[in-house]
Amino acid sequence: MKRKLKVAIIGSGNIGTDLMIKILRHGEHIEMGAMVGIDAASDGLQRAARLGVVTTHEGVEGLSRMPVFADIDIVFDATSASAHTRNDAFLRAIKPGIRFVDLTPAAIGPYCIPVVNGERHLDAPNVNMVTCGGQATIPMVAAVSRVARVRYAEIVASISSRSAGPGTRANIDEFTETTSRAIEVVGGAAVGKAIIVLNPAEPPLIMRDTVYTLSEFVDERQIEESVTRMAEAVQTYVPGYRLKQRVQFDRIDADGPIRIPGISDRMVGLKTSIYLEIEGAAHYLPAYAGNLDIMTSAAKVTAEGVANRLLANKK
């Protein structure tokens, strides 16, 4: 029987619950050890208990007192940016070697986008999964930047209001700041900007994302091929990730430059527009919540890589 490492999830909201179900159903190198929350009546904790997962409603303090904590190697944090800073410090003081996969915008550790730089950070004590919008769009920015120098990249992430729980809503400012920075650090853009839209439409609409880049002039076919390959790579762990239409191009020359406030009044180059749609696997919330699915899928595949590395080192 294949050995698996035990994990704990902090945060029993939409993201934590969806992640728990993914691990229970599809964990390869990891298995559930504990589900941690602060509300005993939350659906996530109650569902975890029904599924046979050990739970606590006393936060990380409760987790540290649980017998299973001694066997926990990896902790997922699906709370908030401010809470994650405290959670990491508290648990690391007790267990210095513990690994964190951070699903908040706290960004204590390096940004991790599995298809772009996931292999690079398997030994990091704490990795940050950026944001749902970042997981969806940064691969596309990286796809452009690997064939052309990107001077500016802007992403717009539109998610169903119903899929945004209290944690997501509390992190809106951190969402834009963390995603913008990761567009630059991981995506390779000189300057990045992120916008999030909570769409109140009923019935809820599927997650849609738009990526704009302004790069040096190159053969458009190179960018289109790079984008297609990157989308296929993301689909290996998020099957519902897809290009909504063909990549669009606009050549902006010196006769008609564009102004980007705070960047330049006369920018020229190749404008690339990429339109994405992310359909969720409906493990917890319905398929419209692609924002949950891409975040939890990216976190799971990252933790699987970390666990595989740890298991190999223990042999």
Curated annotation (Swiss-Prot):
Active site residues according to the UniProt entry: 132
GO BP of this protein: catabolic process
Source taxon at top rank: Bacteria
Keywords from the UniProt entry: Aromatic hydrocarbons catabolism, NAD, Oxidoreductase
Transmembrane intervals: none
Gene3D superfamilies, A to Z: Dihydrodipicolinate Reductase, domain 2, NAD(P)-binding Rossmann-like Domain
Keyword Oxidoreductase found: yes
Signal peptide: none
GO molecular-function term, one example from the UniProt record: acetaldehyde dehydrogenase (acetylating) activity
Catalytic activity: acetaldehyde + NAD(+) + CoA = acetyl-CoA + NADH + H(+)
InterPro entries assigned: Acetaldehyde_dehydrogenase, Acetylaldehyde_DH_C, NAD(P)-bd_dom_sf, Semialdehyde_DH_NAD-bd
Protein name according to UniProt: Acetaldehyde dehydrogenase 1
